[in-house]
């Protein structure tokens, strides 16, 4: 086969409400996943064994890497002995709350299901994806906005598009998801907003009154421990963002802007060392 190059897009969380802690230690949540035009690329080539290389030397390329785990899980599921060589060009920051590793794993499952002619059903691929990580099912089966519950693996595809420019900023702080879950300030007894209804009003009618309800429960603890991350949010709001929030467990922060010129101006106000991305209105991963 000729080498195959595939994009793996990242996401932000528009609201992330942690609703309970299960007996197995996992937390349930409600969130809206929104895709952004920030992506890694993976090149797939023929090989007798499963292997990978990565442009970022800080990431492992052994069995601890999610791409390798995804390939091996499909190999075991299908009882095939085929291999693959993967070259990961890492652009999405890791430890940022943008789901870069989960997206890469989903890409591997989807591509190898075709290349190896496994023909696993969507339900079978979903089951493999959940074992790799809570965000992996979103990247496997969704292209645009999605409402997620459970541990993030129960998904409702929303026939909506976000009519705003999204500025996403990585302030060069890596925050482990395990740390975030250990340190967030729990509020399990509150009344929860209807995120789907509020999002529909925002996307279809432009009603912004519900935006404050899209809280991220990791944000208070992250901001207390990482003041540079808090400063990014304040800068985006001062620059005209109609809403700004931490994404996932951080440290990436995003802002919604009504005008492209405001979004571009906001990006220039942030330190040059911070990695930044601009996503246009209505973006979906099928583009």
From Swiss-Prot:
**Family, per entry:** Belongs to the GHMP kinase family. IspE subfamily.
Instruction: Give the matching Pfam families.
Output: GHMP_kinases_C, GHMP_kinases_N
Q: Where is the active site?
A: 11, 135
- The transmembrane segments are none
Name recorded for this polypeptide = 4-diphosphocytidyl-2-C-methyl-D-erythritol kinase
Query: What are the EC numbers?
Result: 2.7.1.148
Superkingdom, natural source: Bacteria
A single GO BP term for this record reads: isopentenyl diphosphate biosynthetic process, methylerythritol 4-phosphate pathway
Group of enzyme by EC: transferase
Taxonomic placement = Bacteria, Pseudomonadati, Chlorobiota, Chlorobiia, Chlorobiales
Main function: Catalyzes the phosphorylation of the position 2 hydroxy group of 4-diphosphocytidyl-2C-methyl-D-erythritol.
Pathway participation: Isoprenoid biosynthesis; isopentenyl diphosphate biosynthesis via DXP pathway; isopentenyl diphosphate from 1-deoxy-D-xylulose 5-phosphate: step 3/6
Molecular function in Gene Ontology: 4-(cytidine 5'-diphospho)-2-C-methyl-D-erythritol kinase activity; ATP binding
Which UniProt keywords are listed? ATP-binding, Isoprene biosynthesis, Kinase, Nucleotide-binding, Transferase
Instruction: Please write the reaction equations for the catalytic activity of this protein.
Output: 4-CDP-2-C-methyl-D-erythritol + ATP = 4-CDP-2-C-methyl-D-erythritol 2-phosphate + ADP + H(+)
Per the UniProt record, the source organism is: Pelodictyon phaeoclathratiforme (strain DSM 5477 / BU-1)
Q: Which SUPFAM superfamilies match?
A: GHMP Kinase, C-terminal domain, Ribosomal protein S5 domain 2-like
Residues bound to ATP: 93-103
- InterPro entries in the record: GHMP_kinase_C_dom, GHMP_kinase_C_sf, GHMP_kinase_N_dom, IspE, Ribosomal_Su5_D2-typ_SF, Ribsml_uS5_D2-typ_fold_subgr
């Amino acid at each position: 086969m000729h080498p195959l190059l595939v994009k793996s897009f990242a996401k932000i969380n528009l609201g992330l409400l942690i609703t309970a802690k299960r007996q197995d230690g996992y937390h349930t949540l409600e969130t809206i996943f929104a895709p952004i035009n920030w992506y890694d690329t993976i090149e797939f080539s023929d090989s007798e064994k499963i292997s990978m290389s990565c442009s970022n030397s800080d990431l492992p390329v052994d069995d601890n890497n999610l791409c390798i785990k995804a390939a091996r899980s499909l190999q075991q599921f299908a009882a095939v002995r085929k291999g693959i060589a993967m070259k990961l060009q890492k652009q999405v920051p890791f430890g940022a709350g943008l789901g870069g590793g989960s997206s890469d794993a989903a890409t591997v499952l989807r591509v190898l299901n075709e290349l190896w002619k496994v023909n696993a059903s969507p339900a079978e691929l979903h089951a493999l994806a959940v074992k790799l990580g809570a965000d992996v099912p979103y990247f496997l089966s969704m292209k645009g906005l999605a409402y997620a519950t459970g541990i993030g693996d129960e998904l409702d595809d929303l026939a909506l598009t976000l009519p705003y420019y999204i500025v996403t900023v990585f302030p060069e702080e890596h925050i482990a998801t395990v740390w975030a879950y250990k340190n967030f300030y729990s509020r399990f007894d509150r009344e929860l907003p209807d995120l789907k209804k509020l999002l529909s009003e925002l996307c279809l009618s432009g009603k912004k009154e519900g935006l404050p309800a899209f809280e991220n429960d990791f944000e208070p603890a992250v901001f207390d421990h990482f003041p540079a991350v808090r400063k990014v949010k304040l800068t985006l709001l001062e620059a005209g963002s109609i809403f700004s929030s931490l994404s996932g467990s951080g440290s990436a922060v995003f802002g919604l802007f009504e005008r492209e010129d405001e979004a571009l101006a906001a990006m220039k106000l942030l330190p040059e060392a911070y990695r930044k991305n601009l996503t246009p209105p209505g973006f979906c991963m099928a583009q």
